[in-house]
Design a protein with these regions (language model features):
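Substrate-binding rim/cap in mid-to-C-terminal beta-strand-loop elements of soluble/periplasmic
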Residues: 1-36, 40-52
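Long, internal low-complexity/basic segments
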Residues: 17, 21, 26, 105-144
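Intrinsically disordered, low-complexity regulatory regions of eukaryotic regulatory proteins
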Residues: 36, 54, 96-99
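Short beta-strand or tight-loop elements
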Residues: 38, 55, 72-74
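WW-domain-binding short linear motifs
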Residues: 53-60
Length: 144
C-alpha cells in the first residue's frame, strides 16, 4: 500500500487478509470500524512497526475444493474435486526450505504427525468461520 503517512520502501511479511483492509483504512482516517466488520487493522504495520506478530497463520480457501493452512514453516493444502479417492489430494510443503513448493511431503511417513496437526488447525478454522453453513463450505466438507 502507498499513501500519505505510510512508510515508504517498507516490506512486511505479516499475514493479512483482504478483509483486513477496511479496518485498516478506518483507523488511518480516524473513524471507528463498524462492529459488523470482520478483520483487524494492520495500520501499525503500514507505519513500519515490527512489534508483535500480526497473525500466526493463514487459513486458505479457494472455491469449494481447496482448504489449507500456512504458517512460517509449512503449508498444508487439502484439494477435493470429487467424491472418489483419486479426486482427493493432500499437499504439505516445507516453505522455509522449499519456498517454491516443489517437494510434496504429505506422503512421507515422517511428516504424518505434521499433516495431522495441520489438518486439526484447518478443522479449527472451519468451525471458527462456521463454514459448513455456507454452500461452498458444506460442499467441501462433505467430501473431506
Amino acid at each position: 500500500m502507498a499513501g500519505p503517512e505510510i512508510a515508504e520502501n517498507h516490506r512486511n511479511d505479516a499475514y493479512v487478509y483482504l478483509y483486513d483492509i477496511f479496518p485498516t483504512l478506518c483507523e488511518k482516517v480516524g473513524i471507528d470500524t463498524p462492529s459488523s466488520v470482520d478483520g483487524k487493522s494492520f495500520a501499525k504495520l503500514l507505519d513500519g512497526e515490527h512489534g508483535e506478530k500480526f497473525r500466526d497463520e493463514l487459513y486458505l480457501i479457494f472455491d469449494n475444493f481447496v482448504r489449507g493452512v500456512k504458517d512460517d514453516n509449512y503449508k498444508l493444502i487439502e484439494y477435493r474435486n470429487g467424491d472418489k479417492e483419486e479426486d482427493k489430494w493432500t499437499f504439505l510443503y516445507d516453505i522455509k526450505n522449499d519456498p517454491w513448493e516443489t517437494v510434496n511431503l504429505a506422503t512421507d511417513e515422517s511428516y504424518k504427525d505434521k499433516v495431522n496437526e495441520m489438518r486439526e488447525r484447518i478443522l479449527n478454522h472451519r468451525d471458527e468461520w462456521e463454514e459448513q453453513a455456507h454452500p461452498w463450505g458444506k460442499d467441501f466438507w462433505t467430501r473431506f
